[in-house]
Amino acid sequence: MATIRNLKIKTSTCKRIVKELHSYEKEVEREAAKTADMKDKGADPYDLKQQENVLGESRMMIPDCHKRLESALADLKSTLAELEETDEKEGPEIEDAKKTVADVEKQFPTEDA
């Protein structure tokens, strides 16, 4: 049985993952610039290799965040649908959840959307 509390949790989860994804994207940009700068300045090969590893790890997190976001979004949609079936169609939590779903789908279009 879906509850408003579960809906709030799933909404917050989606928001947190979106924030995390943006953070990783910024980190990749920052680390890529740092790596390019190190290459231009002729940095020590060991340091350059370590920096490339850092950049690679940051890049690996983006697809992981996308998968988690798709899963969290699916959970949120199903919880929202369950609540609407039980005639709870209004309220600040439901509006927030609908807004979050719309925002996530607009920013990150999925294959099924």
UniProtKB/Swiss-Prot annotation:
Keywords: Chaperone. The gene is TFCA. Changing E20Q: Slight decrease of beta-tubulin binding. The keyword Protease does not apply. This is Tubulin-folding cofactor A. Disruption phenotype: Embryo lethality. Embryos consisting of variably enlarged cells with cell-wall stubs. Abnormal microtubule organization. Endosperm indistinguishable from wild-type endosperm in regard to nuclear multiplication and subsequent cellularization. Cells undergoing cytokinesis divide abnormally although they display pheragmoplast microtubules and accumulate KNOLLE in the forming cell plate. InterPro entries: TBCA (IPR004226), TBCA_sf (IPR036126). Belongs to the TBCA family. Residues 83-113 are annotated as: Disordered. One of its GO terms (biological process) is post-chaperonin tubulin folding pathway. Changing E25A: No effect on beta-tubulin binding. Monomer. Supercomplex made of cofactors A to E. Cofactors A and D function by capturing and stabilizing tubulin in a quasi-native conformation. Cofactor E binds to the cofactor D-tubulin complex; interaction with cofactor C then causes the release of tubulin polypeptides that are committed to the native state. Interacts with TUBB9. Residues 89-113 have a biased composition (Basic and acidic residues). It holds the Pfam family TBCA. Expressed in leaves, roots, flowers and stems. It comes from Arabidopsis thaliana. Changing E20A: Loss of beta-tubulin binding. One of its GO terms (molecular function) is beta-tubulin binding. Changing N53A: No effect on beta-tubulin binding. Changing R5A: No effect on beta-tubulin binding. Changing I9A: No effect on beta-tubulin binding. One of its GO terms (cellular component) is peroxisome.
